[in-house]
Amino acid sequence: MIVTNFAYGTGPYLRTTDLAIAFNDELQRNKKPRMRILVPWVYGEKQRRVMLEEFRDYDLGYPGEILLDAELGSMLRRVFYGGGPYRDALEKWTKQCQTVSQETHRHLSGRFEAQTLSGGTVEVNGQDIAVELSRSPRVRYDVAPSYFSSFAYVGEILERASSIALHRVGRDVLRKGVEAANWVEEHQTMRFIAYPATFGYFKTWEPRYPGDSLAPPLVPPTRSNTENIKPGVFVTVTGIPGLERLYAEATRLGIALYSNEHEQVPGSERQSPHVIPNKNILLQFARAGWSSIWISMLAGTPLVIPPFDLDDDPEIHFNNVSVKELELGIIYGGQTLESLIMEGPRLKESYDNIKRRILEKFDTLDGNRYCAKL
């Protein structure tokens, strides 16, 4: 059995599941049996809905292979950032990291129940866990060899954050955060850091731990989308000052608004992120998380991100710098929608150049398959 371990948010649980699927496909290609995939069920029915939307076809082909563990999810939720000032979440994590790690270890070492994506109940024996696949994990399970893949080390992010004044996290809390992150991150069997990613704008890459390797973007290749939709903008981030004006401008220009959270975007139509590669999606508005950044880059759909909020995770500050320096998107600063759309050709050319460099280095754009083979 494979167990996944990830950070807060939607992208991490989707992308670790993608990696687990790639791992299983590689096992099958080598004539070895596939393994069940145990996913922490952190976000309740919303997570199940999102995973069904993302992996419906896969679940039909391999029914019951993906399992959701609510008890494990509730443990991770206690150390996750879930809104409010990041400093509060960081302080909570530093205090509970080792305690929650011990709890997850005990849980995963025994017998427990999990659910299939379709809602069936399955009894699981933790002794069957053979491998852990993690993405920027916040705890240690210590039940099987752990394979780490991420956009950066949290320990390095917090170390570098202590030297800038662009956030509201005290140095003492940052220091404790570095200690907690190092305790988790140094205990990994194999490690991959993606390119481009959080510190991709550095001129040279230096491994943090012996055996560190670079990998292509840790998302599946985007699939073409030919749905007949009106020209529009896909919105995956809300609550940013000024976006309401852009929504009104879109209406005036006859440009549609699409979102997977359409209740939070006035006048929008609900669509899955799978439409982002559609030629009629003119822009994607998203927080600077790497799932969104890589999807825009691979799809060739220009990305617009909000400026860094001083109360947010310092990772986002460095992500924004990388997006700007590598020409992966535009930081929103009150521009008109028309001016943002006009930046599209420049960004698409930049995306093509970056993809060419990735292919020259790795011979693939698919970081999950790349890591699974190693």
Say what each PLM segment does.
Residues T4-D18:
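A short, glycine/small-residue-rich beta-strand->loop->alpha-helix junction that serves as a flexible
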Residues R15, L19-A22, P210-V265:
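Conserved catalytic-core segment of nucleotide-activated headgroup transferases in glycan assembly
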Residues K32-E103:
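Conserved nucleotide-sugar phosphate-binding/catalytic loop shared by glycosyltransferases and other
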Residues K32-G44, R191-A197, A256-E261, V304:
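Short internal beta-strands
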Residues Q102-P137:
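Short N-terminal targeting/anchoring amphipathic segment
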Residues V131, V139-S213, E325:
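Active-site-proximal region of nucleotide-activated glycan assembly enzymes
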Residues Y258-P302:
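Donor nucleotide-activated moiety binding/catalytic core segment of transferases
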Residues S291-R356:
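Catalytic binding pocket for nucleotide-activated donors in carbohydrate/polymer assembly enzymes
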